[in-house]
């Protein structure tokens, strides 16, 4: 996987880079695994904006991804590696021996023609999914479940991977991409390997228009708003905040203020926070 630049025909074009998509084998998705995806533009069921800076963008179909990998013991052959507009990782279309088709998150070095399988007896091979208790310590994994049978929730982004550090009783200790060390039940499943599209993080968007295609709208500074729109707004010219520190549009402290709940269930499962030295 690589990125490429462009001739500097404009200031934005000078900086812009794109993926070369060398691993992609087709641009025609499997029709039976597509569903409509309505653009909510950051609104909830009452029509109120709950997430700012969302709206517009390209209209996409959602690809149904198999995060559970619960079809045990049935080998599946990789037929295509595809681009998914709804996530940073690539996806792979696999066809099981009984004819069923599913999409999975494509790991790095998974190729068309490879065979993947899931279940407790699966080999330690890239793309295979099995319970953590059956995975050797030190193995690099992704698509990690937080609750057995619920489906993968951790380590799904492009280029990410976790490492199995230890097993202690009913729990396994993982080192996550953020550096956080946490416990996960050993019955939870994970997939062997690293998520595909390793160079995703070095792509330079280059211009605002590409962000608009992604459905992301501009972010306006509070200091240039009116005082009825933002606590930083108002005043003549470039005015200071006028408070002890910067705040959000709703008056809560911004920049470094901890928003995590004090008594969250997972506190006892986190051995080391991502920002601990």
Swiss-Prot record:
Tell me a GO biological process for this protein. Answer: cytoplasmic translation
The answer, when asked if tRNA processing is one of the entry's keywords, is no
- Spans annotated as Disordered: 215-277
Q: Which GO terms describe its cellular component?
A: large ribosomal subunit
Q: Under the GO molecular function aspect, what terms does this record hold?
A: rRNA binding; structural constituent of ribosome; transferase activity
Show the ranges annotated as biased composition (Basic and acidic residues).
264-277
Q: Report the InterPro entries cross-referenced here.
A: NA-bd_OB-fold, Rib_uL2_dom2, Ribosomal_uL2, Ribosomal_uL2_bac/org-type, Ribosomal_uL2_C, Ribosomal_uL2_CS, Ribosomal_uL2_dom3, Ribosomal_uL2_RNA-bd_dom
The UniProt entry, under Pfam families, shows: Ribosomal_L2, Ribosomal_L2_C
* SUBUNIT field: Part of the 50S ribosomal subunit. Forms a bridge to the 30S subunit in the 70S ribosome.
Q: What is this protein's function?
A: One of the primary rRNA binding proteins. Required for association of the 30S and 50S subunits to form the 70S ribosome, for tRNA binding and peptide bond formation. It has been suggested to have peptidyltransferase activity; this is somewhat controversial. Makes several contacts with the 16S rRNA in the 70S ribosome.
> Which family does the record claim for this protein?
Belongs to the universal ribosomal protein uL2 family.
Spell out the protein name for this chain.
Large ribosomal subunit protein uL2
Taxonomy, top ranks, is: Bacteria, Bacillati, Bacillota, Clostridia, Eubacteriales
């Amino acid at each position: 996987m690589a990125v490429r630049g462009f001739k500097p025909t404009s200031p934005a074009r000078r900086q812009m880079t794109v993926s070369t998509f060398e691993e992609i084998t087709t641009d025609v998705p499997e029709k039976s695994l597509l569903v409509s995806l309505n653009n909510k533009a950051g609104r909830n069921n009452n029509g109120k904006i709950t997430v700012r800076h969302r709206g517009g963008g390209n209209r996409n179909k959602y690809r149904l991804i198999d995060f559970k990998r619960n079809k045990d013991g049935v080998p599946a052959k990789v037929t295509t590696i595809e681009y998914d507009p709804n996530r940073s990782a690539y996806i792979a279309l696999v066809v099981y021996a009984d004819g069923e088709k599913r999409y999975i998150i494509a790991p790095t070095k998974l190729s068309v023609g490879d065979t993947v399988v899931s279940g407790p007896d699966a080999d330690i091979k890239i793309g295979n999914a099995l319970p953590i208790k059956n995975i050797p310590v030190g193995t690099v994994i992704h698509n990690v479940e937080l609750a057995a049978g619920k489906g993968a929730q951790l380590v799904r982004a492009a280029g990410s991977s976790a490492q199995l550090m230890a097993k202690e009783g009913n729990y396994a200790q993982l080192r996550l991409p953020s550096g956080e060390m946490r416990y996960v039940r050993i019955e939870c499943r994970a997939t062997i390997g690293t998520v595909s599209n390793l160079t995703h993080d070095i792509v330079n968007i280059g211009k605002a228009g590409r962000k608009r295609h992604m459905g992301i709208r501009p972010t306006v500074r509070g200091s240039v708003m009116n005082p009825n729109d933002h606590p930083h707004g108002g005043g003549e010219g470039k005015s200071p905040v006028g408070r002890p520190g910067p705040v959000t549009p709703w008056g809560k402290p911004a920049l470094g203020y901890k928003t995590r709940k004090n008594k969250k269930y997972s506190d006892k499962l986190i051995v080391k926070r991502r920002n601990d030295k």
